[in-house]
Amino acid sequence: MVAPGLVLGLVLPLILWADRSAGIGFRFASYINNDMVLQKEPAGAVIWGFGTPGATVTVTLRQGRETIMKKVTSVKAHSDTWMVVLDPMKPGGPFEVMAQQTLEKINFTLRVHDVLFGDVWLCSGQSNMQMTVLQIFNATRELSNTAAYQSVRILSVSPTQAEQELEDLVAVDLQWSKPTSENLGHGYFKYMSAVCWLFGRHLYDTLQYPIGLIASSWGGTPIEAWSSGRSLKACGVPKQGSVPYDSVTGPSKHSVLWNAMIHPLCNMTLKGVVWYQGESNINYNTDLYNCTFPALIEDWRETFHRGSQGQTERFFPFGLVQLSSDLSKKSSDDGFPQIRWHQTADFGYVPNPKMPNTFMAVAMDLCDRDSPFGSIHPRDKQTVAYRLHLGARALAYGEKNLTFEGPLPEKIELLAHKGLLNLTYYQQIQVQKKDNKIFEISCCSDRRCKWLPASMSTVSTQSLTLAIDSCRGTVVALRYAWTTWPCEYKQCPLYHPSSALPAPPFIAFITDQDPGHQSNVAK
């Protein structure tokens, strides 16, 4: 994975945001500035910063000459911080936020302008999240299409590491800004994420109110760097050992990115998170990913809920991109299919009991042989963002009768006497092309098992029959698309007919010889 150069040097504006009259040490948190989006109702947005211990801080929300509300607090002596929770606000704006510190009749004032209320989404992960609009298909057209989205505001966190949890960001690459072709296409793997931007743009098209997008990602990084020590301990992750440099090219030390790039944001009120990571774990703690990923989600949720004084939902929506593919890996390598499976906590679908209120974009059919950034970095981020936003509309916004996931079998029936395996799906299926290798059966004989292809025999709108007569022993399991590169671009065999969403990969045990799994894959 590509690891960008460390971008620092944006600390100076932390002082310049405030009026010249501001006292030394009195300031907003690093990400509270002009053009920002604050979380709308039903939650209350959090405004916080640093000040002189014992001082009183009055936060005023204004629109034009009208005062909307005032909140009064004091600076805590042990942390030099102050915080208020605004009353829930309807989407819209612009507003001005003013903070005034008073100590012994001396006042210092801070102001930020053009503040909107809407939904705030945090986007994180490694380089596929970090890729910019400049790097994707039809970049010129996408970069020219910003004028209609001035209510979608963007913020990008600088790649930074820390040994301990930080209270505030050290630096930012891009302060809250209106989108332009310059800040969306500012080089490769830096500033604003293409997936994040396109996801937010889809949300704005649907919701028609302000969207705030925060990009905090770093290429070549394993999940351990983004996880707190608490969540890693819960999964029994061993202490730092050797890391495979072919897949982990960014920071790998446990928790250093959580400490510096995520924890400082936890006081913010969020709507949700979108996550694109996993490539750096295909040969590193792969077997633990089915624990470390759900644990990360749970820990982020708990920390943001607590940090925002309960304003961020305890189980806020969490979206993920299931891994695409990589031409440099052998098709027999198990890393990619294992991580794809573990990204669902080994259920094959989300949400599930271990990952509630989550949604997923399947990307295994979006391969890109000719990507100048390597096939591990496919350029079609438009489809990724579109599939993500469908999940958000269904899970985060409660839109009914919306197809947001591809078909999974709900029943697998072994007809051994006929040499057939029958799959019944809970959705309609469309066989785009017959592939006699993408389904495989585990055939066991004399205590030895091997995977054999199972060809498609007959297909109907919600069922599929596989021929398994190649197995002379006992069929104990079935898997689908269990390879690094399952198909060419948008050419996997199975899709949902109206939504064009691909069937996700799965593995299922179809006899009681392995009682740990059932043959019902889907919900």
From Swiss-Prot:
Membrane-spanning segments: none
UniProt KW keywords: Glycoprotein, Hydrolase, Lysosome, Serine esterase, Signal
Signal peptide stretch: 1-23
Keyword Transmembrane: no
Gene Ontology biological-process annotations: carbohydrate metabolic process
Catalytic activity: N-acetyl-9-O-acetylneuraminate + H2O = N-acetylneuraminate + acetate + H(+); an Ac-O-9-sialoglycoconjugate + H2O = a sialoglycoconjugate + acetate + H(+)
Protein's job: Catalyzes the removal of O-acetyl ester groups from position 9 of the free diacetylated sialate N-acetyl-9-O-acetylneuraminate (Neu5,9Ac2) in the cytosol and of the diacetylated sialate residues of sialylglycoconjugates in the lysosomes. Together with the sialate-O-acetyltransferase they regulate the balance of acetylated sialoglycoconjugates, key players in various processes such as cell-cell interactions, host-pathogen recognition, and tumor antigenicity.
PANTHER family noted in UniProt: SIALATE O-ACETYLESTERASE
Protein name: Sialate O-acetylesterase
